[in-house]
C-alpha cells in the first residue's frame, strides 16, 4: 500500500469551519480532475459536480434547501465554495440496449455518486482543502436552485475551503467488529 494514500485516508476529516480564504474555479477543476478517476458502473461516469461560488446562490441553497438545519446553514454560508454533487439518473446498471444488467436498479447510481464524492473529498484533502459531505437537504429545491435537468439528481452537498483547524479523528470501530472472515 502506498504510504501517501494511507496517510490521505487516515488524515481526511469532515471540515466544518473554514479560513476566510477564497478558492478559485481553477482550484476546484484540479480536484474534479482527480475525482474523475473514481470507479463507476461499467465506467459510465454518471457523477457531476456543480461548483457554487456565487454568494447569493450559495445563500439560497443554505437558507432554503437544507431543511432548516441551522448547523449546515452556517457551514455553507462560511465555506468559500459549495459543490453540489449530482448523478445522471437511469444510466448505471443499464446496458446500451436499455436492459438492466442486475437487479440493483437505481440504487447503484447512488453508490457511484458516493464513491465519486469520497474520491472528491480525498483529492481535496490531498491538495490541502477541507470538505464535509452533507446529506440533509431537499434535493428537489437544490435541483430547482441550480436549474438542473430532469435526469440529474442531487446526491450530496460538499462545502469546500481551507480548514480553520484539523479536528481530532473520531473513534473508529475495531476491525474485528467490521470484518468477518469465512
Which role does the model predict for each range below?
Residues 35, 83, 89, 99-145:
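Small-aliphatic-rich amphipathic alpha-helix that forms the alpha element of a beta-alpha
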Residues 5-15, 20, 91, 156-182:
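C-terminal helix-cap and adjacent tail motif
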Residues 21-26:
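A short beta-loop-alpha structural element at the N-terminal edge
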Residues 72-79, 147-169:
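A glycine-rich helix N-cap at a beta->alpha junction
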Residues 28-36:
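A structural motif
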Residues 1-2:
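Short, Lys/Arg-enriched N-terminal segments with co-localized hydrophobic residues
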Residues 43-113:
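Glycine/small-residue-rich phosphate/adenosyl-binding loop
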Amino acid at each position: 500500500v502506498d504510504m501517501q494514500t494511507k496517510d490521505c485516508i487516515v488524515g481526511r476529516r469532515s471540515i466544518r469551519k473554514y479560513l476566510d480564504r477564497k478558492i478559485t474555479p481553477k482550484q476546484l477543476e484540479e480536484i474534479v480532475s482527480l475525482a474523475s478517476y473514481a470507479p463507476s458502473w461499467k465506467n459510465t461516469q454518471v457523477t457531476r459536480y456543480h461548483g457554487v461560488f456565487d454568494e447569493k446562490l450559495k445563500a439560497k441553497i443554505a437558507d432554503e434547501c437544507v431543511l432548516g438545519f441551522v448547523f449546515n446553514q452556517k457551514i455553507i454560508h462560511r465555506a468559500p465554495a459549495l459543490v453540489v454533487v449530482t448523478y445522471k439518473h437511469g444510466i448505471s446498471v443499464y446496458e446500451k440496449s436499455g436492459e438492466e444488467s442486475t437487479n440493483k436498479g437505481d440504487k447503484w447510481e447512488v453508490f457511484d455518486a458516493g464513491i465519486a464524492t469520497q474520491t472528491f473529498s480525498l483529492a481535496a484533502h490531498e491538495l490541502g482543502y477541507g470538505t464535509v459531505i452533507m446529506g440533509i437537504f431537499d434535493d428537489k429545491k437544490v435541483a430547482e436552485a441550480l436549474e438542473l435537468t430532469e435526469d440529474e439528481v442531487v446526491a450530496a452537498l460538499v462545502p469546500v475551503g481551507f480548514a480553520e483547524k484539523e479536528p481530532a479523528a473520531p473513534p473508529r470501530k475495531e476491525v474485528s467488529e467490521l470484518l468477518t472472515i469465512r
